[in-house]
């Protein structure tokens, strides 16, 4: 079975963790679309996000406590759901499930650990589907 291609959504505050996670997934052979690797100078970020998502099998949404205030998150979540993509959210430890947006809360999500451990858990979950 081919490994599914994933697109990673994150905020600037989580860029280091997201980069490490993207690299850990790549090290496991999972094809990854990640803005820092795949958006080039002069490109429309929104167009690149949409293109990356269209070419992916799943969206991995890295959430933080302020995610509700970030419109790009909802653009990406809505687009992924509308395209019929699998959506896997990664939330910080100790997150109150009631604080999560309904489209996140109503799907099984992962609790953030080290980028390497989370990438292992994520790649195993994607292959099991």
Language-model features: locations:
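Glycine-rich, charge-decorated loop segments at or immediately adjacent to ligand/cofactor-binding or catalytic sites
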Residues: 95-106
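Short amphipathic alpha-helical segments
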Residues: 4-6, 105-108
């Amino acid at each position: 079975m081919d490994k599914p291609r994933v697109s990673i959504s994150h905020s600037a505050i989580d860029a280091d963790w997201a980069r490490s996670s993207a690299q850990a997934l790549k090290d496991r052979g999972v094809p990854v679309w990640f803005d820092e690797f795949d958006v080039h100078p002069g490109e429309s970020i929104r167009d690149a996000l949409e293109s990356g998502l269209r070419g992916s099998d799943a969206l991995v949404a890295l959430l933080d406590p302020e995610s509700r205030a970030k419109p790009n998150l909802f653009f990406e979540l809505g687009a992924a759901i509308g395209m019929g993509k699998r959506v896997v959210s990664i939330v910080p430890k100790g997150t109150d499930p009631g604080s999560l947006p309904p489209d996140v809360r109503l799907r099984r999500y992962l609790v953030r650990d080290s980028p390497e451990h989370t990438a292992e858990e994520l790649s195993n979950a994607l292959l099991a589907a």
